[in-house]
Amino acid sequence: MMIRLRRAIDSAVTQLEEAGIGSARCDAEQLAAHLAGTDRGRLALLDTPGEEFFRRYSDAVAARSRRVPLQHLIGTVSFGPVVLHVGPDVFIPRPETEAILAWVMAQRLPERPVIVDACTGSGALAVALAHHRPAARVIGIDDSDSALDYARRNAEGTAVECVRADVTTPALLPELDGCVDLFVANPPYVPDDPVVQSILEPEVTQYDPRHAVFGGPDGMALTADIVGLAGRWLRPGGLFAVEHDDSTSVPTLDLVYRTDLFDDVLTHRDLAGRPRFVTARRRESWSA
């Protein structure tokens, strides 16, 4: 790596650390690699960039120090096996949600399963699952036109169907009743509470769409509707997974149990050891 570029990155690391960013070194190198059109691991092989690079790099580092998300600045985020386009009008997929993806990949599904991803946002789960199961019919549902614009772009080259719909709508998509093999959901679930908001990172409170983050006072505004859809859409033996706040694991479990429609109801932890999602299997009998 050329001396001037190394010094610019080191200076950026200091600037980002002073802004309270814990991943300062990673972010500084990611920004440099993005602007240079290379991978982070190949920065050392670069020839000396021109003045335009250093001007743009300075601007990008300044934006990141204002806590503009790294993903907004580079325009993409990795999620499991795929790279997704993201921006200011869509929720940035988090590594925690990859735990659901890993769980699904370990399950047995029919050869051509029907998969629904509710609150799909950028299409993260839908697109990743379509790559994992290319013969599947995958439906991504969201009520945000902006989010679906990203989802459709990310779904190019796959069979993912993007549907604009509100999961709270009564009798939503009755044609799916009893036909779905796998239903996953990552709804907005952060409690809309001043105490909770005070501990969130600025990247969340200032840049993620509120509609995609906060799930009402207790974070569960959509959970009951999603559990109800799972009970209606899943075929007997179909699989269900819903992500939740680490403070609402027990209430989410209770919602699923109380339907009396599911077996094998389990809670799962994320990589940090926090309870993060609940899974269940639709009972073989349709009787409650």
Curated annotation (Swiss-Prot):
List of residues binding S-adenosyl-L-methionine: D142, N186
GO molecular function, one term: protein-(glutamine-N5) methyltransferase activity
One Pfam match: Methyltransf_25
Keywords: Methyltransferase, S-adenosyl-L-methionine, Transferase
Entry function: Methylates the class 1 translation termination release factors RF1/PrfA and RF2/PrfB on the glutamine residue of the universally conserved GGQ motif.
NCBIfam families the record matches: hemK_fam, RF_mod_PrmC
Protein name per its UniProtKB record: Release factor glutamine methyltransferase
Organism lineage string: Bacteria, Bacillati, Actinomycetota, Actinomycetes, Mycobacteriales
